[in-house]
Amino acid sequence: MVSTPLKRLATIGLAAALALSLAACGKGSSSGNSAETDANGTATLKLWTHNAGNDKELAAINQVVSDYNGSQAKYKVEVQAFPQDSYNTSVTAAAASKSLPCILDVDGPNVPNWAWAGYLAPLDGMDDQISKFLPSTVGAYNGKNYSVGYYDVALIMEARKSALAENGIRIPTSDQPWTKDEFAAALAAIKASGKWANALDMQTGNTGEWWPYAYSPFLQSFGGDLINRADYKSADGELNGPAAVEWANWFRSLTTDGYMPLKSGADPAQDFLNGKTAILYNGSWGAEPARASAIADDIVFLPSVDLGQGPKIGGGSWQWAVSQGCSSPEGALDYMKFALQDKYVASVSEATGTIPATDAAAAMVPGYEPGGVNDLFRQFSKEFALVRPVTPGYPFIATTFTKTAQDILNGADPQQALDQAVKDIDANQQSNNNFQ
């Protein structure tokens, strides 16, 4: 992939933050994106995607569109691809000028914000088809489905088999992941062996959405969360309660005990492949380069750690939606139903090297069939994935959590830092009337 999932994580919050500011100025439907109809009665529907420069995924999407256009004459879908770095701002600008396309892709965590801001329309009449997709690939808000994606990725641990074997460390499985105590003992043994510069690398040098995507699942495994998901009105008790404080102390101890660097190097994956690190916290996107490396036979892919409430990993990647102001919503929905056939889920996920969103599609993609070499990543996603908080306020929550987690790693008092984060998050939710 030209644009890796890790790179994509860096830009998630910007568009939602822009949507938040635009919606505050006047929430409502982004109408005005009329479908043009030619002399033969064929309506042209515009489709926007973030995949300019991401040749393999764009080619797969273009094939879906070509097949759809060739299957009927009532609608014609036209693709416009944007560079990822400018895509989100292009969407929010189009929403402000009421010129959104009928069909567009959207990053999963942004869906609640864009739906609340009036950008997106519910995918009415598609519930049965959507029910076959991994829950983390469906963008739902206020009880309605607004988006659905072809794929997801999974957070994993990559470990050197030799480091585990030489130190008598059990290889964990989905059914029996490492416990908190086992993980601590494993790190202590690896460090004591003196063979590794880093027993663990959590990629703390990464920026942006990586922090809430990668580290809030550990908070959730302890029993805390970023906000109370019952009503999304307050983070009190979730982000500053005993479980959250325990998470904060544990997270910082990984650095103070010398198990992982306070700030990882410029390329943690390469550090792992070069023998500097014994265990790398990474995503399923790291499997392909690991298997192509000189140490492929000494690498094992593991589930995340159970810190008390079961392993948790972040869920939700790019998804497809219909805009609220589309003048031919029946055409946009017709395309969506066609495009989400299992064969297209398979072709797009294969092109991107990601986890297919349906069981039938997974059976078509080499490696993701039951028992295939990548099937474990799909099982991790099925069993452990938790989508980020389904509230339009998520962008603020994400940046607040990032700052708080960084402050804690750098020595801030955990309780005080978490209490301040709760105050800030609650104030933001309340200032927006809890996005009601």
Q: Model-found features: residue ranges?
A:
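Extracytoplasmic/periplasmic solute-binding protein
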Residues: 146-150, 155, 181-233, 277
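Extracytoplasmic/periplasmic substrate-binding proteins
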Residues: 50, 111, 214-217, 245-328
